[in-house]
Regions:
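Short loop/turn segments that connect beta-strands within beta-propeller blades
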Residues: 23-27, 67-71, 106-110
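Short coil/turn segments that connect the beta-strands within blades of beta-propeller domains
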Residues: 4-6, 49-51, 91-92, 131
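Residue position within the beta-strands of beta-propeller blades
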Residues: 9-11, 54-55, 96-98, 104
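Blade-level signature of beta-propeller repeat domains, shared across WD40, Kelch, NHL, RCC1
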Residues: 90-93, 97-148
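Beta-rich catalytic cores
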Residues: 4, 15, 40, 59, ...
Length: 153
């Protein structure tokens, strides 16, 4: 979810597989990625700073990214991936789960791959909690107060 611009992203494993996006109210639904770039998209991650959408493809065994509108698709990691299940991002790094390991690499180049955890017990998902991962926007209360002020004036 990209709350600041009110967009929702999701994967569809249908035939053909695709990554889609829509407004939070369901309107303006668009297919962003389909065809040769996609087989089994298992997880998505949004990089708020570079405005990129990352995904793992379990069949193609790659991690790719694109601009938030689906343009400029690029492979970031395409070697050594066996059974990926989750991806997340923080600062200049991406982190992903593959089999029972958690990996880290440069999110721009895919280089400097490091194993952070070698024998995790059945990891399924991966999250990083940090204030930088929570983009600041107008709070609902602020919008509500501004609406009241506008109505009263």
């Amino acid at each position: 979810m990209l709350c600041l611009i009110r967009l929702l992203y999701w994967t569809d494993w249908g035939d053909p597989a695709k990554i889609e996006r829509a407004n939070m109210d369901g309107s303006d639904r668009k297919i962003l990625i389909s065809g040769v770039h996609l087989e089994w998209p298992v997880d998505l991650a949004i990089d708020y700073t570079t405005r990129k959408l990352y995904w793992i493809d379990a069949k193609l065994k790659v991690i790719k990214h694109c601009d938030l509108d689906g343009s400029r698709v690029r492979e970031v990691v395409n070697r050594g991936i066996k059974d990926p299940s989750a991806v997340t991002l923080f600062e200049d790094h991406m982190y992903w789960i593959d089999e029972k390991k958690i990996y880290k690499a440069n999110k721009f180049t895919g280089k400097n791959v490091t194993v952070l955890v070698k024998d995790a017990f059945s990891p399924k998902d991966l999250h990083i909690y940090h204030p930088q991962r929570q983009p600041q926007g107008k709070r609902s209360e602020d919008r509500f107060q501004n609406a009241i002020k506008t109505t009263i004036n």
